A protein has these predicted regions:
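Binding-site signature for planar aromatic cofactors or substrates
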Residues: 1-208
């Protein structure tokens, strides 16, 4: 029989008051068990007309301030986040039968933070940030290939490719984090953390 924590949940939920600490534990375990991209997440956004969209992105950093990913600011998600800063993330790890949902508000990271991450990327990835007009219609693939060639000629020094102003990071400051564990006969286990007005995380159990 699986050990239980103080709330009667599987012991993988531990007994932590801080959901960021629990997220770190689960992410570390996912890195050991997931065959591909344990930091992959679905990001849900919506525009000013409340029409939703969702796509996969990669988490690049997390701490007490939030969860950070990077993108073209003029992409669909970039434009939607400018219109509506409310967003949600979902991590799903099949190898662990676990899921984490996070919702909150989005803000753009500081330029110095974006510069540091951008400069850690490979040359081709940095060129791609310049060459791709993300989410815009392409006439054909040659149009993109030619754009890549142009920017490789412009930035032929692999150590000196500046970050384009239209490319940066977003930080999601969480107001709600839910941890989910698959259960027999769909009797799943769910632990919810909500950030209250006094600045504390409040734990609660949710029905499957």
């Amino acid at each position: 029989m699986n050990q239980k924590n103080s709330l009667g949940l599987n012991n993988c939920f531990l007994d932590l008051d801080d959901p960021i600490e629990l997220f770190k534990v689960w992410m570390d375990e996912a890195k050991k068990s997931e065959p591909n991209d344990p930091n992959a997440l679905s990001l849900a956004t919506s525009n000013k007309n409340n029409i939703p969209s969702v796509r996969m992105v990669l988490l690049k950093e997390f701490n007490q301030k939030g969860f950070v990913f990077y993108t073209n600011l003029n992409s669909q998600k970039g434009n939607e986040l400018k219109e509506n800063p409310n967003a949600a993330m979902c991590f799903h790890w099949k190898s662990l039968l676990r899921q984490i949902r996070i919702s909150g508000t989005i803000t753009q990271v500081e330029d110095s933070v974006a510069d540091q991450y951008y400069n850690s990327r490979g040359y081709d990835s940095r060129i791609g940030a310049w060459a791709s007009k993300q989410s815009k219609e392409l006439k054909n693939r040659d149009e993109l290939s030619n754009s890549i060639k142009e920017f490789k000629q412009k930035f032929d020094d692999i150590n000196n490719v500046p970050r384009p102003k239209h490319w940066s990071g977003w930080n999601l400051t969480p107001t709600r984090i839910e941890f989910w564990l698959d259960g027999d006969s769909r009797i799943h286990e769910r632990l919810n953390y909500t950030f209250d007005k006094s600045g504390n995380w409040i734990k609660s159990l949710l029905s499957p």
